């Protein structure tokens, strides 16, 4: 007998919220029953149907405060609360609230969804604040979930790099590693030159290659504590709206060849990391991996070993892949 789908209340209909919405249309295990955003109904109606990256979703519309999609069973009430405690999660019998506004990232703030009646909260970003929130990367450490009411789905880059690091460390041992994520620009950057707390991010996102920071290396060592002190990294924001790639250069304990490394990834992709880590030998570029549901997809052609140093390139749709893991984690923490 099939179990009931996980009932999700979605707070935030921005980039991740809209990707979660679209990903949910392909899932029998998770259903979105309510969506909250400060946008009015007409804006939600528009963004549900039209997207510059994902294209048009025909049949998506908001009528009388309900979002539906023709040809599907999707039906979610639309709300416009600024206070999460006022959301009708109790009335909607919400199992997991997805906190996807980017605003309520501390444990205390995210817990307002519990006050509103949700059983669990999953934050769609790395957590903030002094009170710790466990970061779960599906396929890597999700089995360490221990009943916490509030957890984080980490970041898209952490979801990209940790499956790769897990395979390399378990198979060959990692002595040290440096990662560089060549990352699509995001809404935190400027369309035109303008003020920003990080000087280089003051420059126009679609006109510049912008070196900046990433918390992915530190987060990776929280997810894989055996790598503490062994990893560091940075980001380079580039003029594409979506589709990213991480370069991971590691000093491995074992002597390896490119074939050894690629075989390990192929085995993982067909085994314990199936659906999370993918591999490709095709001549793909960033636009080719848009809509890819994997957390990460290793570019096997680019694997290189020189004098004991190993370089991996791994692709990821930094919006849609991450959003699919939100669904996976939600299902896991409600089992």
From Swiss-Prot:
InterPro entries per record: GlycerAld/Erythrose_P_DH (IPR020831), GlycerAld_3-P_DH_AS (IPR020830), GlycerAld_3-P_DH_cat (IPR020829), GlycerAld_3-P_DH_NAD(P)-bd (IPR020828), Glyceraldehyde-3-P_DH_1 (IPR006424), NAD(P)-bd_dom_sf (IPR036291)
Entry's EC annotation: 1.2.1.59
Signal peptide, first to last residue: none
Designated name of the protein: Glyceraldehyde-3-phosphate dehydrogenase
Annotated binding of NAD(+), by residue: 15-16, 37, 301, 318
Oligomer status and interactors: Homotetramer.
Record-linked Pfam families: Gp_dh_C, Gp_dh_N
Sites where the protein binds D-glyceraldehyde 3-phosphate: 155-157, 186, 201, 214-215, 237
């Amino acid at each position: 007998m099939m179990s009931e789908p996980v009932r999700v209340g979605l707070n935030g209909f921005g980039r991740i919220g809209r990707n979660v919405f679209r990903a949910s249309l392909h899932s029998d295990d998770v259903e979105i029953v309510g969506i909250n955003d400060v946008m009015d109904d007409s804006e939600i109606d528009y963004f549900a149907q039209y997207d510059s990256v994902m294209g048009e979703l025909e049949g998506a519309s908001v009528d009388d405060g309900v979002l539906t999609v023709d040809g599907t069973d999707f039906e979610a009430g639309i709300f416009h609360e600024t206070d999460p405690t006022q959301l009708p999660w109790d009335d909607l019998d919400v199992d997991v609230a997805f906190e996807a506004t980017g605003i309520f990232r501390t444990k205390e703030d995210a817990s307002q969804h519990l006050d509103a009646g949700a059983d669990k909260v999953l934050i769609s970003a790395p957590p903030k604040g002094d009170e710790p929130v466990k970061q779960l990367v599906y396929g890597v450490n999700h089995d360490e979930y221990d009943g916490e009411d509030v957890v984080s789905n980490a970041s898209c880059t952490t979801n990209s790099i940790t499956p790769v690091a897990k395979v390399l460390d378990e198979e060959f041992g990692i002595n040290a590693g440096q990662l560089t994520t060549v990352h699509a620009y995001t809404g935190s950057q400027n369309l035109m030159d303008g003020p920003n707390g990080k000087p280089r991010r003051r420059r126009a996102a679609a006109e510049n290659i912008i070196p900046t920071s990433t918390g992915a290396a530190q987060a990776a060592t929280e997810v894989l504590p055996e790598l503490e002190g062994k990893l560091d990294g940075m980001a380079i924001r580039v003029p594409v709206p979506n589709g990213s790639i991480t370069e991971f250069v590691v000093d491995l304990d074992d002597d390896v060849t490119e074939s050894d490394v690629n075989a390990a990834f192929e085995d993982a992709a067909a085994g314990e990391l199936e659906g999370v880590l993918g591999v490709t030998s095709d001549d793909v570029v960033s636009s080719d991996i848009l809509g890819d549901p994997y957390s990460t997809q290793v570019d096997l052609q680019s694997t290189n070993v020189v004098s004991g140093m190993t370089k991996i390139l791994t692709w990821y749709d930094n919006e849609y892949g991450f959003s699919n893991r939100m669904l996976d984690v939600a299902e896991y923490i409600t089992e």
